[in-house]
């Protein structure tokens, strides 16, 4: 019984269910378009959310197998199930690939286009784990693209058109998150950071700080333009879109 619980705990911890919060971005497009007054849109979004969550968890299994040696040298990642030897590589690979297939299937239930976006995310993430994470700037772009693909999958699954400004606000917002994450890693680990992530050797705190400021500013500008663009088409007595920019001012 204890062994089964340990195995289950290792599987769940590797799946990282807390990270599913990122997948709430699949609701961004339909929510911004006011589409949640329809149960059909809600159910379609839930299918995509479930699919993206399963797929993302699958990529974590594959990534942890690839990263196991680096994780063992990291102060916190060394406790991950695969790095700590609590979950075998073979079992992790099987679970990872099964979750990828399940996720793509679930995301395809409302429309094949959303499944295609999730499949693209899976492919990009696997490439990131194998190669792209070692290339400076490219690895930041891939992380940002992952967030953008979440929003695109939700829009595709519900046939919600996404404006250029809204997509740009998500893109730059994602770059802000990615650069902030690398800044925190470099600040915490210092020179030792290259032992766990080789791309960090090409970054400096000053450069990442500038990238954070740029992406944050670009996010705000793109969002303001989206809000005012949609306000002109809303024909509402209450300026919801204009009011939404207040927290960002």
Features from the language model and the residues they span:
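C-terminal membrane-associated helical module and adjoining short loops/tails
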Residues: 1-12, 19, 130, 148-249
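Residues within membrane-spanning alpha-helices of integral membrane proteins
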Residues: 20-23, 49, 57, 96-97, ...
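Helix-loop junctions at the membrane-solvent interface of multi-pass transporters
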Residues: 32-35, 109-110, 130-131, 156-157
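Alpha-helical transmembrane segments of multi-pass membrane proteins
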Residues: 52-63, 121-125, 146, 150, ...
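Multi-pass membrane catalytic core of lipid/isoprenoid biosynthesis enzymes
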Residues: 68, 73-118, 164-175, 209-221
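Cytoplasmic-side transmembrane-helix entry/capping segments in multi-pass membrane proteins
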Residues: 136-146
